[in-house]
Structure formats: structure tokens, C-alpha cells
């Protein structure tokens, strides 16, 4: 299989929708439990971006640098929980700011910094909330894309389009809210049961 064929397969509508639903369900219902894995994936992507930056500006052997930096990023984020908490909180705050105040970009950065710091201090409740919201958003986006036929390329150009798609009508709002609430309750009950088993 040629790289172009593989890229077309991975970005096909079925692959994107399936990925969004599976990742959304995992994050929504067991996001806090697998936070170390989730954090490592974030580190992998950030390391990959750093590797791409290095190869563009300083180095010519792209594959080795990108792989090495991605692995280092994944290991750092897996071993140091605070990095994942900061990035998760910052991303959540940024997207909340972009959605609520799209004309004032500076507030998105302020909210990103605020949520990054808050997530360090109230890790459990905020991480449960964030993973439930991200998971529910991924599922609602997949449902919207499946119904309307919107492709992922149409969404990636503007982050606000993600929120517009998720909250486009009352049915999607209800789906999103139900998933968030169910995710929070499920994660809380699972956490409580694990604590009782340990005692």
C-alpha cells in the first residue's frame, strides 16, 4: 500500500467517524482512569510537532528527529503527570474561550492559562469534567458529521466550526449534555468503587 493510499484510507469518512466515536467513548467514560495513557498520547503529538519544527529549521534527517522527539515527548508526559494536566487544562480553556468570545482571542489565552493552573490544584474533578466534555464533544461531532456528510477537512480549518457543529440544534445539545453527565457520573462511580475495594 502506497503512503498516499494509506493517508486516504486513514482520513476517509468511515475511519474518522469511527475514531471519533471510539476515542470519545473512552475519554467520556474512563478518561481519568487512563489519564497516563492519554497524557502520553498528548506528549507524543507535542514531541512530534517539536521534531517537525527542528527538522524544518535545523536538521535534515527528518524521520529520526521526529521519531526521537515524539518518543521523548510521550515518555515525558507519561512520567510527569503535571505536564498532561497543564496541557489538557490549557487546551480546554483555550477552546472554551474561542467558543464563548471568538472576537477576543486574548481571552482564550487567559482562560487557557487559568484552566492549566486550576487543573494542577483540583486535578481529579476538573480532569473528569474535561475528559467527559472532550469525549462527549467527539461523539457529538461524529454524529453531526455522519448525518450531514461534513468531512474532517471542513472542520479542521476553524475550531469554532467544531462547536457550531456540536451545538447546531437541540438534539445535538441534548446528546452532548447527556454524554457529559453520564461520563462524569460513570467516572465518579468507578473511582469510588475502586477506592472502596482498596480499603
From Swiss-Prot:
Task: Using the record, list the residue span of the signal peptide; answer none if the entry has no such feature.
Answer: none
Q: How does it sit in the membrane?
A: Multi-pass membrane protein
Where, by residue number, does the polypeptide cross the bilayer?
Answer: 10-32, 37-59, 63-80, 83-100, 104-121, 126-148, 163-185
- Superkingdom of source: Archaea
Note the coiled coil stretches, chain numbering. Answer: none
**Which InterPro entries does this entry report, sorted A to Z?**
TM7S3/TM198-like_dom (IPR025256)
Question: Where is it chiefly localized?
Answer: membrane
Give the record's keywords alphabetically. Cell membrane, Membrane, Transmembrane, Transmembrane helix
Q: Where in the cell is it found?
A: Cell membrane
Q: Does the keyword Amino-acid biosynthesis apply?
A: no
Show the GO cellular component annotation of the record.
plasma membrane
Q: What is this protein called?
A: Uncharacterized protein AF_1434
The species this protein was found in: Archaeoglobus fulgidus (strain ATCC 49558 / DSM 4304 / JCM 9628 / NBRC 100126 / VC-16)
Amino acid at each position: 500500500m502506497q503512503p498516499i493510499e494509506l493517508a486516504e484510507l486513514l482520513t476517509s469518512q468511515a475511519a474518522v467517524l469511527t475514531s471519533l466515536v471510539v476515542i470519545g467513548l473512552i475519554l467520556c467514560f474512563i478518561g481519568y482512569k487512563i489519564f497516563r495513557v492519554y497524557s502520553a498520547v498528548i506528549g507524543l503529538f507535542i514531541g512530534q510537532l517539536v521534531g517537525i519544527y527542528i527538522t524544518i529549521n535545523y536538521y535534515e534527517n527528518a524521520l529520526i528527529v521526529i521519531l526521537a522527539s515524539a518518543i521523548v515527548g510521550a515518555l515525558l508526559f507519561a512520567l510527569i503527570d503535571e505536564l498532561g494536566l497543564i496541557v489538557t487544562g490549557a487546551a480546554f480553556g483555550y477552546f472554551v474561550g474561542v467558543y464563548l468570545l471568538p472576537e477576543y482571542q486574548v481571552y482564550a489565552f487567559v482562560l487557557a492559562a487559568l484552566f492549566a493552573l486550576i487543573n494542577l490544584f483540583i486535578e481529579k474533578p476538573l480532569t473528569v469534567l474535561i475528559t467527559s466534555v472532550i469525549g462527549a464533544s467527539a461523539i457529538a461531532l461524529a454524529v453531526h458529521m455522519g448525518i450531514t456528510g461534513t468531512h474532517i477537512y471542513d472542520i479542521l480549518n476553524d475550531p469554532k466550526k467544531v462547536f457550531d457543529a456540536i451545538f447546531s440544534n437541540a438534539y445535538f445539545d441534548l446528546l452532548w449534555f447527556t454524554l457529559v453527565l453520564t461520563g462524569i457520573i460513570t467516572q465518579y462511580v468507578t473511582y469510588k468503587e475502586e477506592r472502596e475495594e482498596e480499603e
